[in-house]
Swiss-Prot record:
Naturally occurring in which organism (per UniProt): Influenza A virus (strain A/Duck/Germany/1949 H10N7)
Highest taxon above the source species: Viruses
Key word ATP-binding present: no
Function: Plays an essential role in transcription initiation and cap-stealing mechanism, in which cellular capped pre-mRNAs are used to generate primers for viral transcription. Recognizes and binds the 7-methylguanosine-containing cap of the target pre-RNA which is subsequently cleaved after 10-13 nucleotides by the viral protein PA. Plays a role in the initiation of the viral genome replication and modulates the activity of the ribonucleoprotein (RNP) complex.
Subcellular location: Virion; Host nucleus; Host mitochondrion
Molecular functions (GO terms): RNA binding; RNA-directed RNA polymerase activity
Site (Mammalian adaptation): K627
GO biological process: 7-methylguanosine mRNA capping; cap snatching; DNA-templated transcription; symbiont-mediated suppression of host cytoplasmic pattern recognition receptor signaling pathway via inhibition of MAVS activity; symbiont-mediated suppression of host gene expression; symbiont-mediated suppression of host mRNA transcription via inhibition of RNA polymerase II activity; viral RNA genome replication
Motif (Nuclear localization signal): 736-739
Name of this protein: Polymerase basic protein 2
Keywords from the UniProt entry: Cap snatching, Eukaryotic host gene expression shutoff by virus, Eukaryotic host transcription shutoff by virus, Host gene expression shutoff by virus, Host mitochondrion, Host nucleus, Host-virus interaction, Inhibition of host innate immune response by virus, Inhibition of host MAVS by virus, Inhibition of host RLR pathway by virus, Inhibition of host RNA polymerase II by virus, mRNA capping, mRNA processing, Viral immunoevasion, Viral transcription, Virion
Length: 759
């Protein structure tokens, strides 16, 4: 009240009024600017004049019991005056110092857990090595990069549910934790943060950093993985770069890297199978990366790479609308075109049918090591501005653009026949034929393209047919720029369709991706990739195929045995035997198969000649299309370890060795598993298999008529009983089952029951 009175007195003096109204501060706009809203408009100034006051801080009244009125030096720490307009106390900055030195301490055990991202960053920087600084022009291009090392890949919604569950478990609201990763993280974090005293909001913020991928569109010249991006400000400026090796890897970068390798391997393998799309899906669903299902990673991980995007398209996920050609990502920035089939003649007079894009279009092309802007009309390159790390990278971009332009002089530059094939030995489409041809050798293409004199434009120079720079002349329409072309920034995803040959199209039918675009680069994955699919057995070479095939037969012996006796054709066609065929010499495949199938048929016909070990050993050979011949073999050859090795039809060999005592099989010295049944009692195995669908009731019962042969059993009605002759002339009583459900267990129980019935 005192002050208000004082103000009234001041205002009544004309001089005060004059100062306040005539000086420039009386701009309503300025007054509004500094007084409206809660947001501080000049924080630095505010801080300065606040700190000049004796008691700039307010605190809860309880502070008076927790802090003495004066410190050791006798300075006052808080004032008895109340803060105007609240019931808080005015406190000196010295009180903060006192609190930090003498205040209560809490347990620090949770700090490293809550602030994990920061603690880990410090470790990475501590162990990282910074190299020399180089001054040079930096070709930076904006790319979408991950700025948050060490995160899981949950969606914002999934992360929100996890955070609520961990930090505010008693809050109301439906939370559904479905994915495996959500459940694991929630459990782990709840345990870590028991009795945590850190403010829940802070914990929530830090959890978000750990769970969600954060991306930014930043200018980058070097590495794009998150451990490089976190030190971007230290490693590259406008005209300098500093070498840096991170002091540790983070799982999210490893996941991205391993995902790309797995996807490439899977697409390459699927391409050569009979039904590429079905095979690809089967492999994606049965593969794990670092212990997490690949399909879960694909759903969450935004990595854009050709093979990864093909896998995503196969799973029905949306992908980026840009398309890929020659390893470059093309994004149309303006113009439009219609497509028309046209026949063209190469320099070798070979006819090619190409889909011509008619119309004016502009594209950005972004590759790993070069970028470009391309302007083209119908079968004509108008302008190409390219920038890249080195001569080689620039040349790659120029070749791709020249082929993409579909110009006649490019097609006429073809020397020799075009007959490139993919991994499945199918001819590539004409555009990829041309691309492969010129990627092998582009001399004629560059020589025939033509050159033109150039104007002096800032930041641009010419490039000659031999790929040397020039300021006078350049390849027609082509210029090299110092500046990179930014990657397409939008994160928009579109619905796509995929055909069985793995060609991905947008809704207008434009091909965005095809297996030809998948890089052949081999790398070593950072995380363990576990391919459970038989199609990937061969990725580790012939030995792995051999061991895996036999392991598979042993693991599935119960079902295999039944199929062997009842539906062999279906068994021979199983995809698990496909990889094995590549080990059998081509010339012998059909003869081996015919021989083994005949042998198996004799076993089925003549009861008692059933030999489990021999069936397992020879089964993979029967999968090839058989050739009918009278040939007999005592050993079969497989190509492993760089030469042919023999598998003996009767008896053990280094390739296939069954130890009767331990009942274990070793293939090429590697353990392939144990046989659960006794091979000597194999006859019972077959009969029980043949008696599938019948219940063995006991010894022969004369009331049910003479003993039938196994083949005559099929005429029985459900629930009907009959005597049947099995094995070495024994007769047992059986009943045809009323239900088909328990068929599989029959073969196991039958073995025991036959023994009981006979004995």
């Amino acid at each position: 009240m005192e002050r208000i009175k004082e103000l009234r007195d001041l205002m009544s003096q004309s001089r005060t009024r004059e100062i306040l109204t005539k000086t420039t501060v009386d701009h309503m706009a300025i007054i509004k600017k500094y007084t409206s809203g809660r947001q501080e408009k000049n924080p630095a100034l505010r801080m300065k004049w606040m700190m000049a006051m004796k008691y700039p801080i307010t605190a809860d009244k309880r502070i008076m019991e927790m802090i003495p009125e004066r410190n050791e030096q006798g300075q006052t720490l808080w004032s008895k005056t109340n803060d105007a307009g609240s019931d808080r106390v005015m406190v000196s900055p010295l009180a903060v110092t006192w609190w930090n030195r003498n205040g209560p301490t809490t347990s620090t055990v949770h700090y490293p857990k809550v602030y994990k991202p920061y603690f880990e960053k410090v470790e990475r920087l501590k162990h990282g090595t910074f190299g020399p600084v180089h001054f040079r022009n930096q070709v930076k291009i904006r790319r979408r990069v991950d700025i948050n090392p060490g995160h899981a890949d949950l969606s914002a919604k999934e992360a929100q549910d996890v955070i609520m569950e961990v930090v505010f478990p008693n809050e109301v609201g439906a939370r559904i934790l479905t994915s495996e990763s959500q459940l694991t993280i929630t459990k782990e974090k709840k345990e870590e943060l028991q009795n945590c005293k850190i403010a829940p909001l802070m914990v929530a913020y830090m959890l978000e950093r750990e769970l969600v991928r954060k991306t930014r569109f930043l200018p980058v010249a070097g590495g794009t993985s998150s451990v490089y991006i976190e030190v971007l400000h230290l490693t590259q400026g406008t005209c300098w770069e500093q070498m840096y090796t991170p002091g540790g890897e983070v799982r999210n970068d490893d996941v991205d890297q391993s995902l790309i390798i797995a996807a490439r391997n899977i697409v390459r393998r699927a391409t050569v199978s009979a039904d590429p799309l079905a095979s690809l899906l089967e492999m994606c669903h049965s593969t794990q990366i670092g212990g997490i299902r690949m399909v879960d990673i694909l759903r969450q991980n935004p990595t854009e790479e050709q093979a990864v995007d093909i896998c995503k398209a196969a799973m029905g996920l949306r992908i980026s609308s840009s398309f890929s050609f020659g390893g470059f990502t093309f994004k149309r920035t303006s113009g439009s075109s219609v497509k028309r089939e046209e026949e063209v003649l190469t320099g070798n007079l070979q006819t090619l049918k190409i889909r011509v894009h008619e119309g004016y279009e502009e594209f950005t092309m972004v590759g790993r090591r070069a970028t470009a802007i391309l302007r083209k009309a119908t079968r004509r390159l108008i302008q190409l501005i390219v920038s890249g790390r080195d001569e080689q990278s620039i040349a790659e971009a120029i070749i791709v653009a020249m082929v993409f332009s579909q110009e006649d002089c490019m097609i006429k530059a073809v020397r020799g026949d075009l007959n490139f094939v993919n991994r499945a030995n199918q001819r590539l489409n004409p555009m990829h034929q041309l691309l492969r041809h010129f990627q092998k050798d582009a001399k004629v293409l560059f020589q025939n393209w033509g050159i033109e004199p150039i104007d002096n434009v800032m930041g641009m120079i010419g490039i000659l047919p031999d790929m040397t720079p020039s300021t006078e002349m350049s390849l027609r329409g082509v210029r090299v720029s110092k500046m990179g072309v930014d990657e397409y920034s939008s994160t928009e995803r579109v619905v796509v369709s995929i055909d069985r040959f793995l060609r991905v199209r947008d809704q207008r039918g434009n091909v965005l991706l095809s297996p030809e675009e998948v890089s052949e680069t081999q790398g070593t994955e950072k995380l363990t990739i576990t391919y459970s699919s038989s199609m990937m057995w061969e990725i580790n070479g012939p030995e792995s195929v051999l061991v895996n095939t036999y392991q598979w037969i042993i693991r599935n012996w119960e079902t295999v045995k039944i199929q062997w006796s009842q539906d062999p054709t279906m068994l021979y066609n199983k995809m698990e035997f496909e990889p094995f065929q590549s080990l059998v010499p081509k010339a012998a495949r059909g003869q081996y198969s015919g021989f083994v199938r005949t042998l198996f048929q004799q076993m089925r016909d003549v009861l008692g000649t059933f030999d489990t070990v021999q069936i397992i050993k020879l089964l993979p050979f029967a999968a090839a299309p058989p050739k009918q011949s009278r040939m007999q073999f005592s050993s079969l050859t497989v190509n492993v370890r760089g030469s042919g090795m023999r598998i003996l039809v009767r008896g053990n060999s280094p390739v296939f060795n069954y130890n009767k005592a331990t009942k274990r099989l070793t293939v090429l010295g590697k353990d392939a598993g144990a046989l659960t049944e006794d091979p000597d009692e194999g006859t019972a195995g077959v009969e029980s298999a043949v008696l599938r669908g019948f219940l063995i009731l006991g010894k022969e019962d004369k009331r049910y008529g003479p003993a039938l042969s196994i083949n005559e059993l099929s005429n029985l009605a459900k629930g009907e009983k009959a005597n049947v002759l099995i094995g070495q002339g024994d007769v047992v009583l059986v009943m045809k089952r009323k239900r088909d459900s328990s068929i599989l267990t029959d073969s196991q129980t039958a073995t025991k029951r036959i023994r009981m019935a006979i004995n």
